[in-house]
């Protein structure tokens, strides 16, 4: 396929993973994935994606050392494609450190190749029960991991963006190296331009948003995720 920027995108015509609204295909060289929205998206969503892929990506990930520093913090969409009447986005393949490796085959809870999403490491109880000793990292490495999550969100907010669906599943972590990566960045909120599509995930919802959760989306009294 030819992306909107004129570059070539190659992938296998086989769905490898599915999310809530997208089907994911692997590229031929496995350096990126192509995620197609299962249903046709409206003009507002197309404009949002275009701004995220072009305007905001170029502002955050500049060519200097500072811009390149942030590339490890986000799985940011890099291109837009159209195929069979559907819109898709090209996303860099997650770094291998964000997949479990070295798990004993007899371990019942986690298997090699699973994503290291934040849920596994969100409490001492979960870590001690489900995570093998060789995957836990140290207190210091987990502290570095948490600092990088906070740093990534602060950078988003500094760019005038907000992640409306932050959750355990949308943060990949690696307590061994102390790294973290924010994913699902194609639905970011742009204040006064692109409103949030979801209220958020329980446990991650701001108090003022939770207080008006029962109200309809178009109710002027409803608080939605924003900066």
Task: Label every model-predicted segment.
Residues 178-179:
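Generic structural signal for coil-to-beta-strand starts
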Residues 183-189:
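Activation of the activation-loop gatekeeper triad in protein kinase-fold domains
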Residues 226-227:
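A conserved short alpha-helix in the C-terminal lobe
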Residues 72-141, 194:
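Conserved structural core of kinase catalytic domains
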Residues 33, 90, 182:
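Short hydrophobic-acidic sequence motifs that mark active-site Asp/Glu residues
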Residues 144-146, 153-175:
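Catalytic-loop of the protein kinase fold
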Residues 1-48, 52, 68-76, 82-84:
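ATP-binding glycine-rich phosphate-binding loop
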Residues 195-218:
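Conserved activation segment of eukaryotic-like protein kinases, specifically the C-terminal portion
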